[in-house]
Amino acid sequence: MHKEEELWTGNIDDFLRSCNIKAIISAPKEEEIRRCYELLQRTNQLNSSGRRLSIDKVREILQDNRYESFVLKSSDKFGDYGTVGFLIINKNGERPTVTDFVISCRVANKKIEPTLINYLANRYGGELLFNYKRTLRNGPMHAIIEELAMQPYASSDTYETYLCKHDASYPDIVDLRER
């Protein structure tokens, strides 16, 4: 992709559209739990919380009705990237809240991350809270907050929480589907 991107003379959104980026989200299956755990352990730059959950804690969350979780798979005209993301939403508060969001650097800067968060804001009635804990390495995750113009909502010793409102005008670069 990098060579083709370097040769592209149009704007980046047009280039990304030409890549035919596809993303599929679904509830994690038993055989995907280990990959979800691996993403939580290995992902630094695109990790919203910085948390390192044990595999037992991941299983516990997946069975808890207060949470909804998604795995993210992606492909484009250059290939199939497999399972590249994992996201946990706490549905128990005043608004659904993304507590953890990790995505592989293999698909960074393809607009998948903000497309997914914007989609979920719409799915949950137009608004979604997003927990973010700044670490030494996850600045790229904060860029998503800025790209979606999330507004500061609350702050604690643990997280900064942002309000994400669905933006119907967000570019349709990624073909995102839910299974």
Identify the residue ranges that each predicted region occupies.
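Acyl-donor binding region in acyl/amide transferases
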Residues: 77, 83-152
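Low-complexity, flexible helical/coil segments
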Residues: 60-63, 108-110, 154, 163-167
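Conserved helicase motor core of SF1/SF2 NTP-dependent helicases
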Residues: 1, 6-23, 27-45, 78, ...
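Generic, low-specificity signal for short hydrophobic/alpha-helical stretches with a mild N-terminal bias
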Residues: 18, 40-43, 71, 98-102, ...
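A conserved beta-strand-loop-helix scaffold within acyl/acetyltransferase catalytic domains
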Residues: 28-96
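Terminal substrate-recognition subdomain of acyl/acetyltransferases
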Residues: 1-21, 122, 126-179
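Generic alpha-helical structural element
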Residues: 25-29, 47-50, 109, 130, ...
